Amino acid sequence: MTNPKVFINPKSGSIRLTGTVDIVDSEGNVIETIENPKFCGCGYSNDKPWCDGSHKKITKPALTLENARLAKTAIEPFAPERAVAIQIREKLVSARTEMNESIVGLKIGGALESKENQTGAMIYGYLTDAMDVSQGLVAADYIYPRAEAEVVFKISKEISAPITIDQVLEHVDQVSVGMEIFDYRYGQAQIFSNDAIADNAGAATFAYGEWINASMNVFDNLQTSLLSNSDVIETAPLSAIRGNPWEAIVQLSNLASRQGLTLKKDWIIFSGSATKGVPMTSGSTYAVDTPGLGVVTVQAQ
């Protein structure tokens, strides 16, 4: 058997072996046999000490996005492919759950597919318990925060397959008024669907009001307003949400099913916005007022 050759990159410190290499455990049992492995020590690969290609495509972009969030500094979009964008999102969210945050639901969003393809795409991002800002927020903790007026659904029975609008009340028993604060880590740069997906659909923080019982006509003829310091900035009918807010759940069930995601019991789902996003600044109070559904207020420090 020919011994593998070793190349050490003096700049990066990575080690590349040429030939067939057995990876063994502490007892000498072969775990995996690989050809020409590279051991970079970067910590970016998917739970392996050698590079599997994921560090450049998936984990490093996720780390870049997370660092941008923590540093409140915008980064440039990097236009990943769709499948890679989804994996970046999952890696980004797993970093938060590893810090003991719990997933409590999803936010629905939308983005154009590309500069050439102006078709709108439904996307979603995960919400965690640490994103709840019902007690107020600090505007300086964001890059370019914007508030949106939304509807919030509470899942009463898990959704693991596509459902129809006639089935929504079997899975949602309560609804509320919601304010989503979104904050893409790309700042004010124009982005398209894949960058949006990678950045967890811009999910930043949220707040919602008191729950009320759901019914098929609960949203009929309702108007919502987004206010800043008691001044109405945006107004829209709830029908601006996909023609009927219930359609948000129907369409999400299809998208989640295609991606192998189950909407879990007790999750909250933010519908996507009825209004344009309103930039948030320190010292202002923001409210979403939807008569017939409720009011939610967030103070920005």
What is each of the regions a protein language model found here?
Residues 49-61:
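Iron-sulfur (Fe-S) cluster-binding segments and ferredoxin-like electron-carrier domains
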Residues 46, 274-278, 292-295:
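Short, charged beta-turn/beta-strand-edge "cap" motif at the junction between a beta-strand
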Residues 25-26, 228-229, 290:
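Structural motif
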Residues 1-44, 48:
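N-terminal pre-ligand scaffold of iron-sulfur
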Residues 64-243, 285, 293-301:
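Catalytic-core "active-site belt" of small-molecule-metabolizing enzymes
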